[in-house]
Amino acid sequence: MTLDRDLFYFYLTPEEMNAARAYLYSSSTSSIEISNNSKSNNCCNNSSIPSTPNTPITPLKNNNITIVNNKTNDNKINDDKINDNKISDDKNNDDRIVLFEETFFSQLIPSSNSSSIPILETFMNDEEFEFTFDESKPFCPTNSYCTLNQQNNNSQFFTVPSQYVTKSVSIPSHFINNTPISLSNNNNNNNNNNIINNNINKNNNNNSKGFKNILILRKIFTLKKKKKK
């Protein structure tokens, strides 16, 4: 599954950005665990930015991050190494990969009477880094609370167990291919799972100028330094 950067964004708190920088400064090449339960007043001027379900992710404390590898799990990195906005080239390891488990939701579009929302605050647009999805683990591989079923080229169905359907964000329903996003219950599925049906048939555009809610999903993605040409 490929997602258009213009349609989908990832929200990282400053603490999580620090964690990513800490990893890139480190000599470890293993994955890191990042909390997305951090509260931040510096991200957005819109109260609809959601918190995420309680899931077993290692929390960040005092801007420290635990680098997890096969040898040790107590390699703390202090935030005095990660305040620089630039990633140092001193430790250039082209094979280094960062794994994030992060909140996943559609881009928020502000209403006409509000200022723009600074959602995208990651390395995504940095020419020095690649941004890719882990296709082998499409959604929630560690907690298994949501799955992706792509049935055909016309529709995509995201199934989320109802106990995690507690937060949502409002987006313009006409933002994705001029098509509304329908949010409904699937009574044929176990536990009354909720379905997001993003039908890309442009003829199905009822209420296309309104606002719909879309559920929060979680996604594994990778960020790695590009190889030098």
Curated annotation (Swiss-Prot):
Domain of life of the source: Eukaryota
The protein's name: Uncharacterized protein DDB_G0282865
Phylogenetic lineage: Eukaryota, Amoebozoa, Evosea, Eumycetozoa, Dictyostelia
